[in-house]
Amino acid sequence: MSWQTYVDDHLMFDIEGHEGHRLTAAAIVGHDGSVWAQSATFPQFKPEEMNGIMTDFNEPGHLAPTGLHLGGTKYMVIQGEAGAVIRGKKGSGGITIKKTGQALVFGIYEEPVTPGQCNMVVERLGDYLIEQGL
């Protein structure tokens, strides 16, 4: 299965029981910042934005004072799981990032998708990739 298939079929799909509710954008990005696969709507990010995200996984709390930036959009960092999940909020939407052994799984959402639904979609794929040694 290609990485693009993971994005298309496991991130950018209608959320169970909520037809038409899906993430706004999603991607799988290597720890080095290389994009493995992404939705057409995933923002173009800067290397320093990815560096900040990776630093926060290694030093939890790093992004809290400045916020999480991705593609020029600033998200307020909210409670995640230190070293495993970063969550951010911006207005009625937000972002969830799950770290696996080799990659970061990104999900970006807007209403009517809820933070919990985004977390479920992103973390389920991230946990699967971890189980596969990825």
Curated annotation (Swiss-Prot):
Pfam families: Profilin. It comes from the Eukaryota. The modification Phosphothreonine is found at T114. It is found in: Cytoplasm, Cytoskeleton. One of its GO terms (molecular function) is actin monomer binding. The keyword Cytoplasm applies. Belongs to the profilin family. This is Profilin-4. It comes from Olea europaea (Common olive).
